[in-house]
Amino acid sequence: MPRLVTLLLSLVGLVSCGHPTPEIRSLDPAHPPERLSDWGIAFVAGGELRVHAQALVYDLNTPLFSDYAAKQRAVWIPDGLQARVLADGRLEFPVGTVISKTFYYPLALDEQGTGRIRVARSTGGGTAAGIDLDSHLPVETRLLVRSEDGWHALGYTWDLARGEAFLSPAGAMIPLELAGPDGGQAFTYVVPDANQCSGCHRPEHGGELQPLGPRDWQLSDWSAWQARGFLDPTAHLSRTPVRWDDAATFPLEQRARAYLDANCAHCHNPSGPADTSGLHLGLDQPLDRHTGLCKPPVAVGRGSGNRPYDITPGRPAESIMVYRMRHNDPAIAMPELGRSVVHEEGSALVESWIASLPGNC
């Protein structure tokens, strides 16, 4: 067993004794505590990273890809308050709401001796309230906190030697190795800094920072939110949910469009940070030039790969979209933030969809 992993697991033993269960507190996000546990929503106890029982652990139907990390998502809304479902499916949360998302990996405990912590690919998050620290590595926990003046984004990086995650406004770089059938892939997991958090969570120029994932059709268990009292029990979904990886239930085009909406549309929309590209990838955008169909590139430099169109119907290998999804060069790769490795399954989905499109440019 590599020394780094041995050390990691020995450190887990230091934090497995547990602490009294804290209370969830909605603190002033303008002056956040250094320790994640001070918020009370996520903490280490009994050898697990746990979510407070007053919070709701939830999952998304089509989540954002983040270097094959699993994500433990949780939301807490103060007693007596509810989120309101807007006409477009976004949720309007009350003041005091705390949303947490912990990024973690299953540990791959095979002998490699690379000096990096070796982790396994995860296919999702799920709704388990506890993460076993004997077999998993938490990397970071991100908080979104709703105050009177809007949302605040806070990042905490995990230090298992102290059984705690600490505020990291400058971000962090964590060397890891991703195990696979053909060996390991070394990569650097990037914990975003405060500016990067704000950049992605402002889907409109000059707009307010806001949550991206929890829209009504994205919630994998809508009824659980209603049963907990976090949503009006009479509220209805604004659109049919789609799971990007469920080929048995959902058509190829629906799955590909849902994937692009979740992974790209917060920037690629008419008012977003990537509006100058003219590429709009939200679910409400019809399949036309704005979605990339036979659309020439705009100021992408090497990002075009000498390909003429974002999407060339029937020809994924000739499509800029696939070229950029399949690339890791920072000057070429898309999305440009949030990933250091290629999402093989997501890229394959978009390739299959483009291959199925009829017509010519």
Predicted regions and their residues:
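Short, glycine/acidic-enriched capping/hinge loops at junctions between secondary-structure elements
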Residues: L86-D88, Q112-G113
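Bacterial N-terminal signal peptides
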Residues: T6-S16
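Sequence context surrounding c-type heme c attachment/ligation sites in exported
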Residues: C17-L27, G115-C361
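Conserved small-residue
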Residues: P20-A87, F93-V95, S100-L107, S122-G126, ...
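Internal, charge-rich low-complexity segments
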Residues: P106-R118
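Positively charged n-region of N-terminal signal peptides that target proteins for export
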Residues: M1-L4
